[in-house]
């Protein structure tokens, strides 16, 4: 066969349908092979050249219809492939020599793609094609199929007759569910061995027009400006059809407008593109003011307009264009405005506009065309009512002009879409006279005056004028004078000095200027006031001497470093530098002072040794005008060399030691006094009263043999003063018992009266109801000779209470009076 020299074209030829085919005839019309290689000689081929035969038909049968997926080729007479256009070799052909001879093998185990229409009516199962292997001459062959639609979902759609190989369709197909099935055919021998490779079986479901078109929306909405030209696009509608629109017309949708409402100005205002569904304006005359909205009934028809139809609604909104000019209503106005009123509303202008409210074509824009030479007025648009609001930008002057005639034009925010006449209004403004405030001339007056002028010296005259035509009297006074330096004559406006003007006063003077505000008042009805500003530029005089800074220095007394002090002078040139320095009050004995060449610093040096201490250096500085200022510099001299790093404090032992000794002596005296007090408290004198005094007899009843563990009783628990009294619970429901306080006699000056003083005060103490019983120091653990204490056995004495003498209770004071009365009168009972 040789090596090919031209391009090779591999074509997949699809059988579309068979017109007539008799399965029972021995001749079968089939493709030569599943893949056929055709040779085109030469680098360039002319159209119409036959390349080769690919299909073997049967005599007497009508030819089959074929199609190819390559537009460069066509099938002639149902069998021969030929070129449709001129072909050129696209890429250089690479030839690889080979000694192997290429041979073409005939294959019978091939089935062409099978086309089956959807929605078939049967009867089922329906034979589609027969699988045939050429190995059936040698052995018995059994056929089977696998794949989706056979043994996998959807199962059972197709089947095969096991022995004959007929491919069967078991139920109707739906192309919209599955458009193509890919199955595999198998051939096995009786013993189950495969005799053929699995064969691909393609089943194409051909479409039928079983679906109507569907619009994507029930209602479509679009908009277009009024007055647009024909051909302007409005919107696009879309309908879909599930049927095939590639190989058939079943899914090809054609659009049309069924009706239009309203039919104004006529019934064909819009058109729709048949294929794309684009709605456009076809006629002029869209006017929103007449028809703001159109409703179109649109329809979609499949089969390219010859099939099933569905409808939807398209609403077209006509947008407003500025085709109507605003008009003043009315066109003439008169208004009255008081003079000097700023921001005063003069008049509201009303307009009408047929365009859509609150749109740019409706919102008005006002412009003052004439009559406002002084730019006294302004006009704005009210955002809701669309009215024009005329207000005063400046105050009007009745004396200058008492009437203004204004001309105002109105347009819209959006430009007109066509040439339209504009509307103009006339406003006559009458100015009303009012009492105007006096006006200082000038409003801000600058006056130069020398600082420090004498009190009562005139500064200037500052007066105001009355804008009114009437001759009104004006009075003056100072409204604000921060330092209180000035006074103003109420009739003439004469300003005089009442204080010392000081240019260097930083609290009230800024940049040599002292600001004062003055007031003028007329006698009109009602009276009005005006203010003016008086700016006094204070001229400097040499009233301040130079001073050094800083005024405290620290310097070493050995190899000292010179101290540089800055010189400041509050005055201005020429009352400042050059400065001169001089030491006074014998400061020049140990110090020197020199002014540097620039004249802005003074150098202070220590020329003799000084011991560490603080000294006063008297430095006198004078300026160019010989204004002298004496300043005392506090100089701290340290025991050090050169620069001062640390300055140790001087030893002050001569002062500290006496102070320390005095403190120690005071502490020693306090310690001795404390010891004496403590020793005095420890001395206890036993109180031995007469033995016949029954009050001192303490009977010890605790002796019960063996002795008591506690031999000493804490007598401090019995000797309680007034400070140890229990707390009194306050009550507000019981009247308190008032106990009289005893009256003690003061100590007499005469020593002879001491005895009476002791007796009287002892009696007062004994009768004191607030004192505790036995207000004496009792020693209960004293049981020496003479003690009347006995054993507890004395309690069993046969003596009765009647043998006891209780008269001594009367001697115990008022607190035991009740007890003495109870026991003292027992025999009488």
Swiss-Prot record:
Signal peptide boundaries: 1-24
Self-association and partners: Interacts with CDCP1 and CTNNB1.
Chain ranges on the Cytoplasmic side, renumbered to this chain: 678-829
Membrane topology: Single-pass type I membrane protein
Primary site of residence: membrane
Cadherin domain segment(s): 108-215, 216-328, 329-440, 441-546, 547-650
Keyword annotations of the record: Calcium, Cell adhesion, Cell membrane, Cleavage on pair of basic residues, Disease variant, Ectodermal dysplasia, Glycoprotein, Hypotrichosis, Membrane, Metal-binding, Repeat, Sensory transduction, Signal, Transmembrane, Transmembrane helix, Vision
Cellular component GO terms held in the UniProt record: adherens junction; catenin complex; cell junction; cytoplasm; plasma membrane
Domain notes: Three calcium ions are usually bound at the interface of each cadherin domain and rigidify the connections, imparting a strong curvature to the full-length ectodomain.
Propeptide: 25-107
Disease per record: Hypotrichosis congenital with juvenile macular dystrophy: A disorder characterized by congenital hypotrichosis, early hair loss, and severe degenerative changes of the retinal macula that culminate in blindness during the second to third decade of life.
Protein name as annotated: Cadherin-3
Membrane-crossing segments per the record: 655-677
InterPro entries per the UniProt record, alphabetical: Cadherin, Cadherin-like_dom, Cadherin-like_sf, Cadherin_CS, Cadherin_pro_dom, Cadherin_Y-type_LIR, Catenin-bd_sf
Cellular compartments annotated: Cell membrane
SMART domains per record: CA, Cadherin_pro
Extracellular side: 108-654
UniProt-listed GO biological process terms: adherens junction organization; calcium-dependent cell-cell adhesion via plasma membrane cell adhesion molecules; cell adhesion; cell migration; cell morphogenesis; cell-cell adhesion mediated by cadherin; cell-cell junction assembly; hair cycle process
Entries under PROSITE patterns matching the protein: CADHERIN_1, CADHERIN_2
Function: Cadherins are calcium-dependent cell adhesion proteins. They preferentially interact with themselves in a homophilic manner in connecting cells; cadherins may thus contribute to the sorting of heterogeneous cell types.
Tagged with keyword Iron-sulfur: no
One family name in Pfam for this protein: Cadherin
Glycosylation sites: 200, 566
